[in-house]
């Protein structure tokens, strides 16, 4: 029997490339502010004095948005900017010396900058790069003040494309760092950085084998490894053995019971089933710590119900609420998109079935699962019940569904598959509504309104995507698409057009 961690004290962060350490109940949180490396371009015959103002503007913009920064000293080059190839290499080496201290780079173009120094500076940045160019001002278009960054930005992006240096461009084409539009750009770029840095290398736990009935959740483990996703696979019998070895009065088990009772309503769950759920929760925490898992998928039926007399939905719900994406039914691919959305939004994600029509409204759908939805995505506190599907044929075997309703909020839905060695993914947006679902509908569900839903469903069906979709809070399609295509190399299927 391994030495299991105390309840909630899971490690996690050491194994991921990104994600944060747990708090007192194991919620993932960032250990430091997201940090940008600031880089400034120059060109000899342009008004270089404008760069000094840009340094001040950019520092103010970044810090007021709540982020941190690193910046090469002003004395290192003329105005602390890069123009020549040698200056670019100087910045390159400075950035290399600070590797691990920055999450993305903002390349600031106060004027029509020299693209050669820029390419030398950032060709090995290894993180997302945001292209920012200053606008010109009416009334300040004389030679001493004209910037021409509108044009110069194309020279930089042209050469970066030739060098195959990935970069991000946003609307508007030119934008002042102290404007509200750039504050929005910064927020989205920070989300892109979190997704890219968190997805390019991480560990994903596969606890149990795929049940043969669920061929819909097949995946290619070697394809995932090509994208930096390591799958750690465990037999369910090992989990059963560790659960059996735990004593009912073990302090770790008692602490987990307290945590679960505080998390949701356990008032009707028989004590033996509650204890078993707590033991499984302790074992899942051990897997997360021991193998430094950043996300997991669990074989949730029907062995746990038959032999342990529980349904682990509420445990997945609690893990998701902690920022540890946890998918049911060994749906590894859903766990991948759940992690991406958690990184983008910094809020829990969940996996749901495309389950029911909602009356005659063709743009509405009931999204449902038995109970793995994070409590923070629900309209009110859930209630742990017996899974009605299992109770029908084997009463007393399905305790563990966290039942309730999903709150109304803007949402993004996304999922992926592996095919021919590639990760193929889609992302789109909609909203959960306040439409009621009748009381007799079991599990955790919500009504989603999705524009042009019927055409999107046809594209999902033709594309071979599964009956699951991952859902996250907020609209983040553009952030995910940028991260997936420009930096991570996923193949994105556009279901919106």
Where is each model-derived feature located?
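Long, internal scaffold/assembly segments composed of regular secondary structure
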Residues: 256-257, 263-344
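Short, Lys/Arg-enriched N-terminal segments with co-localized hydrophobic residues
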Residues: 11, 15-30
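Extended hydrophobic packing segments that form well-structured cores
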Residues: 394-497
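Conserved anion/nucleotide-ligand pocket segment
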Residues: 38, 191-219, 363-386
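Metallocofactor- and cofactor-centric catalytic cores in central/energy metabolism, strongly enriched
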Residues: 31-155, 171-193, 205, 210-214, ...
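Conserved thiamine diphosphate
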Residues: 157-173
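C-terminal catalytic subdomain
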Residues: 323-436
């Amino acid at each position: 029997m391994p030495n299991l961690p105390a309840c909630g004290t899971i490690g996690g962060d050491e194994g991921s490339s990104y994600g944060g350490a747990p708090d007192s109940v194991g919620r993932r949180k960032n250990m430091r502010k997201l940090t940008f490396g600031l880089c400034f371009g120059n060109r000899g015959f342009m008004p270089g004095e404008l760069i000094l103002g840009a340094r001040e503007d950019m520092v103010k913009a970044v810090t007021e948005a709540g982020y941190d920064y690193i910046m090469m000293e002003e004395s290192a080059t003329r105005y602390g900017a890069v123009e020549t190839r040698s200056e670019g290499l100087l910045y390159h080496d400075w950035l290399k010396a600070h590797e691990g201290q920055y999450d993305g780079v903002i390349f600031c173009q106060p004027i029509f900058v020299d693209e050669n120094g820029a390419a030398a500076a950032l060709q090995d940045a290894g993180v997302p790069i945001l292209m920012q160019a200053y606008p010109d001002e009416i009334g300040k278009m004389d030679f001493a003040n004209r910037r021409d960054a509108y044009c110069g930005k194309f020279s930089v992006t042209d050469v970066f494309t030739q060098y195959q240096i990935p970069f991000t461009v946003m609307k508007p084409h030119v934008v002042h760092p102290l404007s509200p539009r750039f504050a929005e750009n910064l927020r989205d770029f920070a989300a892109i950085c979190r997704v890219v840095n968190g997805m390019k290398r991480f560990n994903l736990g596969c606890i149990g084998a795929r049940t043969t009935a669920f061929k819909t959740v097949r995946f290619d483990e070697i394809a995932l490894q090509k994208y930096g996703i390591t799958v750690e696979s465990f037999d369910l019998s090992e989990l059963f053995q560790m659960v059996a070895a735990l004593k009912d009065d073990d302090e770790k088990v008692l602490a987990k019971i307290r945590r679960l009772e505080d998390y949701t309503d356990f008032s009707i769950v028989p004590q033996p089933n509650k204890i078993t759920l707590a033991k499984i929760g302790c074992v899942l925490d051990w897997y997360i710590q021991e193998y430094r898992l950043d996300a997991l998928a669990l074989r949730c039926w029907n062995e746990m119900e038959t032999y342990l007399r529980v349904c682990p939905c509420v445990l997945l719900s609690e893990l998701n609420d902690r920022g540890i994406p946890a998918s049911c039914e060994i749906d590894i691919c859903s766990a991948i998109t759940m992690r991406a959305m958690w990184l983008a939004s910094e809020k829990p994600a969940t996996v749901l079935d495309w389950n029911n029509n909602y009356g005659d409204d063709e743009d509405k759908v009931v999204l449902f699962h038995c109970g793995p939805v994070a409590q923070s995505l629900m309209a009110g506190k859930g209630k742990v019940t017996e899974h009605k599907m299992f109770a029908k044929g084997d009463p007393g075997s399905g305790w563990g569904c966290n039942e309730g309703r999903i709150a109304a909020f803007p949402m993004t839905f996304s999922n992926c598959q592996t095919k021919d060695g590639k990760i193929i993914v889609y992302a789109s947006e909609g909203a959960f509504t306040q439409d009621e679902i009748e009381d007799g509908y079991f599990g955790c569900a919500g009504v989603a309104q999705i524009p042009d839903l019927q055409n999107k469903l046809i594209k999902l069906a033709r594309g071979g995507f599964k009956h699951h979709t991952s859902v996250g809070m907020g609209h983040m399609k553009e952030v995910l698409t940028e991260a997936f295509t420009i930096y991570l190399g996923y193949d994105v299927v556009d279901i919106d057009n």
